């Protein structure tokens, strides 16, 4: 297995978006006066590794179920193209799981034993997404899973590890990140509706029709911006407005785009999650630093 093939399996372009909820939660914790560098680094590592597990497991199980046909419109997957063997990919998955478990144990030892449950759920979730007896992605629950894992678990969990407690602000921020992240999957499943119908992958849009996708995309954008409400100041609103305009333009592009051309929208949506994280950082930072001076809501 060459490095290039490993990279295709790891899918580095998916990683910045998976880090977004972790980084924003770390920033919020730091502004609340809690920052532990060691646990912060370990949390970032667990976040990256969990995403890689999900990517590799996804390839493995989709291949096994025959969901990645030759007429695939998505990015190149070495396994379904016969460039790597099933065993090689399985071994890579096992190595990644071991690395994640070890990093996770270090994190649990440094913070709270409760995290063991969260960690087990993260690994199970990453695999159960396309594998196991009830693959979420095949039952129209992919978006819900993304919201839970990339929103509440990643954001809320990161904040809890730093602060030892949760705040409503942290939950609002984590949810905002979750809704923003959902759109990556929305575009992905919108693109794949035809193949998914054939391979019995009953995604939301296979179940309720393709026209739901752009509507859900828009709803996610609006919800993510609205959920930053605890932190808004005038500058924050301007920043979110710029983000909103860009994403709504992308949503209109999505409506006019078909098939493999949607990969561009997918990449730009993933970049949009990173952009939203930057926006959230600006919004939070301004709120904490200047608060009421800029017409923001009073911070307790």
Which residues make up each language-model segment?
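Topogenic membrane-insertion module of multi-pass membrane proteins
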Residues: 1-42, 46, 133-134, 139
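Small-residue-rich segments of transmembrane alpha-helices in multi-pass membrane proteins
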Residues: 16-25, 144-159, 206-210, 267-280
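Membrane-embedded alpha-helical segments that form the functional core of polytopic membrane enzymes
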Residues: 22, 32-60, 116-124, 167-187
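Acidic (Asp/Glu-rich) catalytic motifs at the cytosolic membrane interface
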Residues: 49-73, 182-205
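Multi-pass membrane catalytic core of lipid/isoprenoid biosynthesis enzymes
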Residues: 70-113, 201-235, 271-274
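Intramembrane alpha-helical segments
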Residues: 77-165
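Functional transmembrane core segments of multi-pass inner-membrane proteins
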Residues: 146-193, 211-214, 293
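Extended hydrophobic alpha-helices typical of membrane-associated regions
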Residues: 233-293
């Amino acid at each position: 297995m060459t490095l290039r093939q490993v990279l295709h399996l790891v899918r580095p372009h998916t990683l910045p978006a998976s880090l977004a909820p972790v980084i924003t939660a770390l920033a919020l914790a730091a502004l609340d006066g809690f920052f532990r560098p060691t646990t912060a680094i370990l949390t970032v590592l667990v976040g990256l590794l969990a995403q890689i597990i999900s990517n590799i497991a996804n390839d493995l199980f989709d291949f096994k179920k025959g969901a990645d046909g030759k007429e695939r419109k998505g990015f190149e997957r070495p396994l379904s193209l016969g460039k790597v063997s099933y065993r090689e990919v399985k071994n890579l998955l096992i190595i990644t799981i071991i690395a994640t478990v070890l990093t996770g144990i270090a994190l649990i030892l440094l913070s709270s034993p409760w995290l063991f449950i969260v960690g087990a759920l993260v690994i199970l979730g990453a695999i159960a997404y396309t594998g196991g007896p009830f693959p979420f992605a095949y039952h129209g629950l992919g978006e819900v899973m993304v919201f839970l894992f990339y929103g509440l678990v990643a954001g809320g969990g990161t904040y809890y590890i730093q602060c030892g407690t949760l705040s409503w602000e942290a939950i609002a921020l984590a949810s905002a990140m979750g809704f923003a992240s959902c759109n990556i999957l929305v575009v992905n499943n919108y693109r794949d509706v035809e193949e998914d119908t054939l391979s019995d992958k009953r995604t939301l849009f296979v179940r309720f029709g393709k026209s739901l996708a752009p509507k859900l995309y828009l709803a996610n954008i609006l919800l993510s911006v609205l959920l930053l409400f605890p932190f808004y100041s005038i500058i924050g609103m301007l920043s979110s407005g710029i983000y909103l305009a860009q994403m709504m333009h992308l949503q209109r592009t999505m409506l006019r785009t078909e098939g493999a051309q949607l990969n561009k929208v997918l990449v730009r949506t993933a970049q949009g999650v990173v952009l939203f994280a930057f926006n959230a950082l600006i919004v939070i930072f301004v709120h904490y630093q200047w608060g009421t001076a800029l017409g923001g809501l009073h911070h307790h």
